[in-house]
Amino acid sequence: MADFAKENQFTPDQQAEIDAGIKNNIDVSIYAKPEFLAIQMHEIRIGLVEQIPVFYYADSRYDWFQMEEIRKGLEMSLDVSKYADPEISFDRMRQIRKGLEAGID
């Protein structure tokens, strides 16, 4: 595994998320990228720890609110393909997710 601490390209908050992932024994290379904000890294790390398919949202085009909505949908085994689109606002994503939870397609 790469030594992300020595690359000195991350903020202290980003480095903390990388360190937390290493402690969680997950593949931090998925999110240890300078283009992700620390809070985005956090959402990806949570997904990795929970063993959900983070490839749906491990993309810097999503803000962390959008990532959270996609992650919550994945946790509930919802069809997130209906709203996993960086062009859809997080509040619209939430509406779609809540509809899917309620059985509304």
For the regions a protein language model found, what residue spans apply to each?
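General marker for long, soluble alpha-helical cores
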Residues: M1-D105
